[in-house]
Amino acid sequence: MMKYLAIALMFLLAPVIVADAQESQQNYEIMKLIRQEKFDLILPGALRDNNVDMWIHVVESGRMDPLALDLGGWTEYRAWEPVCYYIFTDRGGDRIERIILGGEDLDGFYDIEGSSHDLLQIVEERNPDVIAVNMSESLGIANGLSHTSYLRLAKALGTRFTERLVSAENVITDFRVRRVQREVAAFAHILEIQRQVMEAALKRIEPGVSAPEDIGWWAADQLLAQGIGPSYQAASLFLPYMPFSYMPVESADGVFQRGAFIMWDMGVGHLNLGTDIKRYAYVLKENETKIPAGLQRAWDNGQKAREVLKNTIKVGRTAGETHDAILAAMESAGYVSTPSDDRTSQYRDLMKELGDSDKFGFSVDMHTTGNTSVGDAATGPQMAPWRSDRAHLVIQPMHIFAFEFEFNAWIPEWNKRVSINFEDNAIVTHNGVEYLSPINEDIIVVR
């Protein structure tokens, strides 16, 4: 399977010259193909594996639903239809029946198109035992059903069918995390563009001249030229694009100074996909010809730890089981667990306890990515001590995630213990963990 993916990526990443090529049309056709493949290949298992007969996804007119690009159709600004029902029913066979009520099927994906007032008739004719709807206590993208829409739904269905309602969070989770080949190829393509832009941007730093925003805006322009924007939904779209002096020198007068260790955490969004990676650079001091020995030692051992982690993550385990296996493997290799169960000061406190010893501490945050950058918003298993609500989820084949871990070490030249947060994006297959783009193997040196 991965052999064919590799071949697809070769063609995808190679320069292609097409007369009068239209990028907008290309993006539309890619999204359409992914949606079709997900409906045909992923949706049946997402319902059947969770013992769901019917999935009703409720969308209010004028509100952007988290699954809008996954499901397609037109639901916005339809004053005559204040609510839209996407209805997916398992009626046997090799496909799931697809119905849209109160919206418009623009691409021919749905078998039946009608009014939202037809809901009860549709449900009665199919008489499902279990009806999953988009309400959830813990998963934001599966909780788009507002209170008023729930009341409207319950009134339309009546007590008989309302009593059969369950959360669709498991259906939505499986529908999202089970990937089709074109989805993975698109993600890898976007990720590689981002990686090249970030690394090129860091190499442009002029000590004492370049400010973080100079580098950030340049990178933003390069990405936007290819139609790629940020995936973090921040108040300022500029926020994800700014690198900063991580250690030990602050940016005097707002520019990068010599001796600065720079960290850059960025996520980009495109084609209903979101990335999340980090890159590091070091600005040599006037009398330096290479990275300080203490920092290089920490980095090299972090790369060794990466291999231990990479060999521990397998398909078929739950996130919780995987986290336990990671702790055992890392501690067996001589690393000290310095976790944070509450995402506050616990990690820093444990790190300080190691002081100036030669020991290396670590904590992991192997969170899902793929459709969004941040694990808190993404579906799927999360391997992190503070993400226990996702610990029961099983790592499935083609699981895309942020290969992220914090690694701390004493740096003699700086007289302090420093934490380095490694992060690249990867996929788990039956072969193990595979990176979707070249990793941050070396610190970028700025002279």
Model-identified regions with their sequence ranges:
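Positively charged n-region of N-terminal signal peptides that target proteins for export
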Residues: M1-L5
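Bacterial N-terminal signal peptides
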Residues: A6-P15
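Active-site neighborhoods and metal-handling regions in enzymes and metal-associated proteins
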Residues: D20-R447
